[in-house]
């Protein structure tokens, strides 16, 4: 199972979520439309607690990527891995006023997909996160795409598959 947090202008039926479902993944995508970060974090934490027994992959895109990164740090033992798509890790908003504290939790395999043409969230944000996180970054896909990653669904599916494979192998 993948729990996917959509972006600020995204929806629970966005193209990334649809692509993952079409590839056979069970995806739970809560509706965060109109919520600020603290509300998203609270809702996602509740949902993740409800599904902790499944050890899902936690995923997020843009603002949802920031939400997922925060939740992964709060409750790392509950997830198989972390999949971040153009995560907005540079935003300073409660509950995270210092973006440099964000890291992939120790031992949590993490995949990042970020477009080199992203004009909304600089790829440098993901590169700095990966550097702070060290060896827990399983894959980093620098794709020839923009912020929406509309041409990179195959990389997203590949990343999810790699994280799922970690579950099978362990």
Regions found by a protein language model. Give the residues of each.
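Acidic catalytic loop of the alpha/beta-hydrolase fold
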Residues: 10-11, 91, 117-121, 148
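Post-His helix in hydrolase/transferase enzymes
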Residues: 41-42, 150-164
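Gly/Ala-rich beta-loop-alpha elbow adjacent to hydrolase catalytic centers
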Residues: 59-68
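Short beta-strand/loop motif that positions the catalytic acidic residue
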Residues: 105-106, 112-114, 118
């Amino acid at each position: 199972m993948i729990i996917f947090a959509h972006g600020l202008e995204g929806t629970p039926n966005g193209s990334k979520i649809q692509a993952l479902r079409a590839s056979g993944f069970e995806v739970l995508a809560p509706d965060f439309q109109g919520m600020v970060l603290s509300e998203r974090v609270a809702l996602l934490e509740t949902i993740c607690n409800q599904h902790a027994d499944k050890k899902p992959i936690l995923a997020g895109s843009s603002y949802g990527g920031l939400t997922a990164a925060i939740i992964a740090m709060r409750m790392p033992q509950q997830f198989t891995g972390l999949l971040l798509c153009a995560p907005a890790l540079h935003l300073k908003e409660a509950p995270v006023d210092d973006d440099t504290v964000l890291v992939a939790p120790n031992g949590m395999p993490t995949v990042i997909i970020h477009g080199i043409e992203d004009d909304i969230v600089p790829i440098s944000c993901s590169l700095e996160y990966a550097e702070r996180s060290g060896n827990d970054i399983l894959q980093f896909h620098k794709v020839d795409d923009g912020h929406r990653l509309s041409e990179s669904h195959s990389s997203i599916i590949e990343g999810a598959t790699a994280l799922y494979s970690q579950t099978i192998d362990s």
